A protein has these predicted regions:
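Cytoplasmic helix-loop-helix junction between adjacent transmembrane helices
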Residues: 1-16, 200
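Juxtamembrane intracellular "pre-TM" segments in multi-pass secondary transporters
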Residues: 61-89
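Intracellular juxtamembrane helix-capping segments at the cytosolic ends
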Residues: 1, 192-205
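Helix-loop junctions on the cytosolic side of multi-pass membrane transporters
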Residues: 54-67, 261-271
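Residue-level signature of mid-helix packing/kink "hotspots" within the transmembrane helices
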Residues: 20-21, 133-141, 225-226
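Short amphipathic helix-loop junctions that connect adjacent transmembrane helices
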Residues: 106-123
Length: 271
């Protein structure tokens, strides 16, 4: 039911978040146990099993839209009451993925500079990346339910603020343990943002255009995944590893300002 969108999309988002954040450590372990070339075979088998499960177990009550009833992109946007909110959600998706992926090129090197331990640096890096997935798994469904009660826009803003608070001290940590604690807290932010974004999109978009709008949001997500490593490596090369977290925090701060501006009229309403 539509009133349970936050909980349902929160649970669904948990799988996507967990896969993105935990996969590096799983991939590293599999490569160590079975060899790097066999990781591709194992991944292919898992994807094949997932395909079969989707075909035979996922059922939906889908009513296709007649071709004559299909809306153009302009018509979809004209039927929306909160277009600026939607644009802001696209930006939030992009910034979220940029933040997650911007540290990818430098994380192992950053951890090595903190610890000086070259033997276990890959294991520790995988653990620190994955720990954010654990907290996201814990928090995502619960935060989705909270969003259903108090409004997903409030949960989204809370997630952005927590994200900003976590990124700043990451630039000044002295040990990998401190970085791991902050990454764990950052996972709660991720668990708040993804369900809130998806739920708000479903609520403000006309039924006839939901799939198309989600595809635009996915495009922003993919762009963030491409942009993140480029930004991270460029900033690290020019200003040092710590600067990556500060630059990411600046992106998040700008997103907070944009979100407050877009939500100013609906902050205390349930969309």
């Amino acid at each position: 039911p539509k009133e349970k969108n936050g909980w349902a999309l929160g649970t669904l988002s948990t799988g996507a978040i967990a896969g993105t954040l935990i996969a590096p450590s799983i991939g590293g372990a599999l490569a160590q146990w079975f060899g790097m070339e066999n990781v591709f075979i194992i991944t292919g088998v898992i994807l094949f099993i997932t395909t079969l499960l989707t075909i035979f177990l996922v059922k939906e009550d889908f009513q296709p839209v007649e071709k004559k009833d299909l809306l153009t992109t302009k018509e979809i946007f004209s039927k929306m009451d909160h277009v600026s909110v939607l644009i802001g959600l696209f930006v939030t998706t992009l910034i979220l993925q940029l933040g997650i992926t911007s540290i990818s090129p430098i994380l192992t090197l950053y951890i090595r500079s903190l610890s000086g331990d070259t033997e276990n640096v890959l294991f520790v890096s995988g653990l620190i990346v994955s720990i954010a997935g654990v907290s996201a798994i814990i928090s995502s469904p619960t935060l989705g339910k909270i969003g259903d009660r108090i409004g997903n826009q409030k949960v989204l803003l809370g997630g952005l603020i927590l994200s900003f608070i976590c990124y700043i001290p990451m630039a000044f940590v002295q040990t990998p343990f401190q970085l791991g604690v902050l990454r764990f807290l950052l996972g709660f932010s991720t668990g708040a943002l993804m369900p809130s974004i998806n739920t708000l999109i479903s609520k403000i978009t006309p039924t006839e255009g939901v799939s198309r709008v989600y595809s635009y949001n996915q495009m922003c997500s993919n762009f963030g995944q491409v942009l993140g490593p480029m930004v991270g490596s460029t900033v690290a090369h020019g200003f040092g590893y710590s600067s990556v977290f500060l630059v990411t925090a600046c992106f998040v701060l700008g997103n907070i300002g944009l979100s407050f501006f877009n939500f100013r009229k609906v902050l205390n309403k349930k969309l």
